[in-house]
Amino acid sequence: MLFVAGSYKTQLGIVVSAFIGVVFIFILTDPTRLYRLTSYLSDPSQVHQTWQALIGIARGGWFGTGLGGGIQKYSLLPEPQTDMIFAVIGEELGILGMLFVLLSYTYILGKGFNIAKIALKKGRKYSSFVAFGICTWFAMQITVNIGMNLGLLPPKGFTLPLLSYGGSSIIFSIISLAILMRVDMESRTSYVKQREYV
C-alpha cells in the first residue's frame, strides 16, 4: 500500500527491512518455529500435511478421481476443508481442475486491479487504494495457500478465498468483493447518478 500511495523508496525499504528483521528474530528465538522452517527446507516429507497434499495431487493426475472420489480427505490430509482445499481439488478434479481454479482467480484479480486503475484515472485515490489493497490481499492469500498445497511454502494456516470452509473467511471475502464492486460502480457513474442509488 505504501508503494501504491507513492511513498519514497528509501522509506519503503526501511519498513520492509525492519519487517524482515523482526520476522527473522521471531523465527530464531523460538525453537518450534525454527524447527518447522528447517525441517520443511531440509525434507518436505517430514511435514505431514504437505506430504499428504502432494500425494493427493499426484493421485489425481490430469483428470482427477472424480468429485467425491478422493481418499486423502478421509483422515489422511489434515484440514482438507480449509488450508488444504486446493490439494483436494487437485485429487478429485486433477490438474485441469486446478488450472481452472487458477484461471478463475487470475480473471478476478485482473478485473480487480483494472477497477483500481480506473478509479485512479477518475481521481478517486482513496477508492483506488482500497481496491488495490483488496486485490493484493487476495493475491497474497491465494499465492501462500497454493504454495502450501504444492509444497513450495511451509503450512501456515491461510485459507483459499471463496473456496475454503470457514465463516469468517467467506464473510470477509464476500464483503471485500462487495467493496470492490462498489468502487467499480462509483467509478463508472457520475455523482448525480450515484445520488439516485442512495
Name each region found by the language model.
Residues 30, 34, 106-113, 136, ...:
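Alpha-helical transmembrane segments of polytopic integral membrane proteins
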Residues 42, 58, 62, 90, ...:
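Signal for well-folded cores of large energy- and translation-related assemblies
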Residues 10-100, 125-127:
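Hydrophobic, glycine- and aromatic-enriched re-entrant/interface helices and adjoining loop segments
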Residues 141-198:
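A juxtamembrane structural motif centered on a specific transmembrane helix
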Residues 23-27, 134-144:
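Alpha-helical transmembrane segments of multi-pass membrane proteins
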Residues 1-32, 114-123, 180-194:
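Alpha-helical transmembrane bundle and helix-membrane interface signal
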Residues 96-140:
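Hydrophobic transmembrane alpha-helices and their immediate junctions
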